[in-house]
């Protein structure tokens, strides 16, 4: 598994390249992320690193979490994520990740929780076609048939129906890095990224 870096979605804007072409980009505030723990094959049975992000006041964290962070002399961090690695030799506790691990033109994968739309119907959630709106029709926004009769006598699992829409983890792959602002730890990614403004985002190579 590749090591990811955590960040916050700032919003969308446009970026003009050398030819004057307008490119829609998503601005992400990445890092700084701190390694809070290193797990090895000898002590834990697998190699992994634990990364923390977003410093907060101590009152917002539980005492067990604060005790865990103080073992590595880490600041109070709100988010902790673990990543499997083949070797732990290249990492050390308190090592900091930021925009310095990325390059302009590089393609990355971005994961975040999509915007929740609540309980949504067939047309909005699955893009079903609606029925006739006049001429005596009573089937306007209904799903139509959802299965057969006595055989099989049930609705098959996975049938597209109304229900909760959004609020799920979504990963967009191969988004190109258009620009990097090292001073403010900002990444400008070409295209859209899941989630609302302020959402927690994971960027991985």
From Swiss-Prot:
Record-given protein name: Large ribosomal subunit protein uL3c
Compartment annotation: Plastid, Chloroplast
Family classification: Belongs to the universal ribosomal protein uL3 family.
MF (Gene Ontology): rRNA binding; structural constituent of ribosome
Entry superkingdom: Eukaryota
Subunit structure: Part of the 50S ribosomal subunit.
Gene3D superfamilies the UniProt entry points to: 3.30.160.810, Translation factors
Cellular component, GO, one term: chloroplast
Matches recorded under InterPro entries: Ribosomal_uL3, Ribosomal_uL3_bac/org-type, Ribosomal_uL3_CS, Transl_B-barrel_sf
Keyword match RNA-binding: yes
PROSITE patterns per record: RIBOSOMAL_L3
PANTHER family, A to Z: 50S RIBOSOMAL PROTEIN L3, LARGE RIBOSOMAL SUBUNIT PROTEIN UL3C
Region of interest: Disordered: 127-153
Job description of the protein: One of the primary rRNA binding proteins, it binds directly near the 3'-end of the 23S rRNA, where it nucleates assembly of the 50S subunit.
Keyword hit for Transcription regulation: no
Species this chain originates from: Porphyra purpurea (Red seaweed)
Gene Ontology biological process: translation
Entry keyword set: Chloroplast, Plastid, Ribonucleoprotein, Ribosomal protein, RNA-binding, rRNA-binding
């Amino acid at each position: 598994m590749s090591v990811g870096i955590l960040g916050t979605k700032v919003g969308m804007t446009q970026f003009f390249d050398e030819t004057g072409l307008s490119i829609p980009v998503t601005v992400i505030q990445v890092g700084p992320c701190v390694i809070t723990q290193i797990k090895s094959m000898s002590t834990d049975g697998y190699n992994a690193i634990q990364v923390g992000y977003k410093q907060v006041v101590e009152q917002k964290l539980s005492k067990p979490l604060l005790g865990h962070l103080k073992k590595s002399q880490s600041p109070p961090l709100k988010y902790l994520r673990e990543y499997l690695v083949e070797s732990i030799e290249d990492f050390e506790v308190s090592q900091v990740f930021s925009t310095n691990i990325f390059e302009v033109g590089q393609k990355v994968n971005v994961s975040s929780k999509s915007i929740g739309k609540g309980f949504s119907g067939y047309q909005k959630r699955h893009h079903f076609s609606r029925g006739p709106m006049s001429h005596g029709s009573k089937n306007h926004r209904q799903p139509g048939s959802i299965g057969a009769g006595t055989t099989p006598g049930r609705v098959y699992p996975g049938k597209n129906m109304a229900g909760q829409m959004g609020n799920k983890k979504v990963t967009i792959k191969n988004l190109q890095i258009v620009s990097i602002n090292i001073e403010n730890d900002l990444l400008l990614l070409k295209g859209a990224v899941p989630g609302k403004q302020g959402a927690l985002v994971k960027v991985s190579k």
